[in-house]
């Protein structure tokens, strides 16, 4: 079973005393019995994706998961996912260290990235740190268009890094969320995956605001979120 650790809950446990901390501790009493964990390892992201949870959280507390804290997780879990709910794992300065430790322990890992504001050399260092890892690259549309949702992203740089990653890791996966601006480019993206030996993860979203200009035209390309009373 996989447990996702959200940064906000994590900070509540660390920051507050008394009843608040106690109640959260009780909620995660079975935390260490899980087989896998999804970690938000920092509070950092350089992108400004409109439908991201970051846009609705007024105060995101600054935090970096320390190496000592990570070592605690490493003792208890066999599978790690670095898929930030409000952060991008590539922006943690010790991501390569975490990956190296997971690999040395013979454990599995996947990494989800979309930010492009680190030097190429750091990405390569992280790729090399865990040769059996799987990486998901968030490029929503053709590389030249991905910034239309992934605001401030250099999609062409990330595509190039995705191709480079094939030399070092187990799987390089193109994660493609369907939007109005890219719904007609899916077949082209699939052809690029075949050409370059990539896997594709095609995602239909349900995070749509009323009259959302990013919402695909075709009803086959999105989900409708159920409304509950």
Where are these regions (language model features)?
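Conserved strand-turn element in the central/C-terminal portion of the radical SAM core barrel
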Residues: 162-185, 205-207
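Conserved alpha-helical substructure of the radical SAM core
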Residues: 3-6, 10-134, 145-156, 160, ...
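A glycine-centered beta->alpha junction motif in the catalytic cores
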Residues: 139-143
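PLP-dependent aminotransferase class I/II
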Residues: 174, 190-195, 225
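Aromatic-anchored helix/helix-loop segment that forms the rim or "lid"
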Residues: 221-229
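Flexible glycine/acidic-rich beta-alpha junction loops that bind and position SAM and/or redox cofactors
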Residues: 181, 201-222
